Amino acid sequence: SECLSLADYVSPEGSTIGLFTLKVEDSRPHCDCQDFQHLLRESLCARLTEALAEWMQEQVCEGLHVIRPAFGYSACPDHSLKKDVFDILDAPEKIGVTLTSSYAIRPTTSLCGMILAHPQARYFSIGQVGNDQMTDYCKRRNINREEGKRLLGF
């Protein structure tokens, strides 16, 4: 089996990595209700956010083969990386998105991820993380092992 990393799609000579945070939000006041109209609006906003991400990718990466992994998913399971992106992009101030203590994005109809351009780029799951890999990751992120396991979902 292959052992892939998103770093495989970044050239040692230098590459550009795109970072993004997007949202589409219903302008009506938020409610915790579960009525059909509210759920329908939330669902529509989530689909429009995905469409916005597709449009952004086409505008930015015309003619390039790219992937758009989101933080917290199989190729990059550490949700805490969203905080770094929010800080770099000043996302809370610019578009009004926030993170919960568990790194969920508010509003929930938002996305945060990266764009990587590489001819062989593809989506994958990191799979099992070895002890040496966990140690290295925790050292690079300046976190303890327990925090690393929690952030990576192990």
Features from the language model and the residues they span:
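Small-residue-enriched alpha-helical segments and adjacent helix-cap loops
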Residues: 1-132, 140-143, 151
